[in-house]
């Protein structure tokens, strides 16, 4: 018993010293604190928010978005920027590909006047800028587009045909080691957009891999695999793509869930389309033949007409979204006045 008391006393002294040197909360017993609900940035698609399990992209974490060309990777990232800005956050876009279209970003709801944009000359410069911005503690979200375009300085200054094996992988590994703790401390989300490559000589399993080595796979809390599954048509005119996103890795909720949504050309993710799909799945919107109804009132015939109705009636769209998220446990239901929130019984 005396030995146990001595150990407890020594531990208490050590904990006090740690908190004195590194600040309160730098070490704690796991049972002392209640589980904190993970804050998230909405993606623009309620279906994807639900698949992520926390209502969007987790704050203070690294997210990798990868997939084939023109699958919707940058569109998802720009919608996240627009939603973060709508909540008053400051966002940055590291445009390593030098391909950002400000006009398209504006159509998606991005405030381009306040968006911080950098078009770096090489990979080292891009990641140093990103690291400095993160350590300022002022950012809500930073996007790096793309990992494949983070070319090391030595490769840019070298000759064509020179071998630079593993340079980019080492660069990414070092940068992510430095940034991970700073992102968590600042509550900043970092989105790395990545491209696909083919592994040569693979006989079994998928030959696809992402660029930049293995570090990003390890450090990412969420990895999203974005694929275009079909082309949307209005008559004979192509108006957009049906996109499927698989949550390939998720450290904050169960992984491997999938979400499908529409990306319309010039408009981005169709929020209304996701609300219709999820509303029908949850039983909040009723579908009878080609007619859709909500609260016993017809919304319209055909998905396109309902989409137009919800776009013109944002209050109805917001109400449906609230009900979907509440139904799926991602948003707490409003408790009427005079009702006990724990039991649901009326208080007298």
Curated annotation (Swiss-Prot):
SMART domains: AAA. One of its GO terms (biological process) is DNA repair. It is found in: Cytoplasm. Coiled coil: none annotated. PROSITE patterns: RECA_1, RECA_2, RECA_3. GO terms for cellular component: cytosol. Its main location: cytoplasm. One of its GO terms (molecular function) is single-stranded DNA binding. Signal peptide: none annotated. Can catalyze the hydrolysis of ATP in the presence of single-stranded DNA, the ATP-dependent uptake of single-stranded DNA by duplex DNA, and the ATP-dependent hybridization of homologous single-stranded DNAs. It interacts with LexA causing its activation and leading to its autocatalytic cleavage. This is Protein RecA. It comes from Cutibacterium acnes.
